Amino acid sequence: MYWEEDNQDNISKTNDSIVDVSFKVNCKKIAADHSYDLFEAVLKKFPQIKEIENLAIHSVYGAESGAGWERPETEIYLSKRTRFCIRTPKEHSKDFFSLKNEILKVGEYEMQLSKPTIKDLIVTDTLFCRSVVVENSNNEEEFLKNVHSSLKSMGVNVKKMLCGKEHLIKIPKKTLVGKT
């Protein structure tokens, strides 16, 4: 854990040039390691994403446990409230409306997208990341030092960090190590 006290209030402002395009999804379950398959599915329906800078395709999130139940490691069960999000420059946001009602083939699963909504980014003092790719198997302290250094170089002042679970991300010809 990385911890630094700060009693100063910093006023932050959001950059309104980036937005989230958010879709409700109709899909009962999806592979736990679906990130690359999801990217490929979006690329197939919307090849222009290769040309868009500052674009992020977020993986789909499902609960890990609840009411005594724990999620299997291979699949994520999705609720009716599950959303799929593409973070994009505002000038490209309306382009993604072409994905309305499309069915994405994500690995062996099919995921139907609803009509999207555009959501502005909000200012927050908490940054949560489901997956940070790690170049080598750093111990937690080394990993947090590297993350702190990277964020500082981008002008992000970090006061507290907590490392989560390590997981594998499979892409063609390679397996990456990620940490939350």
Descriptions of predicted regions:
Residues 1-180:
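RNA-interacting cores
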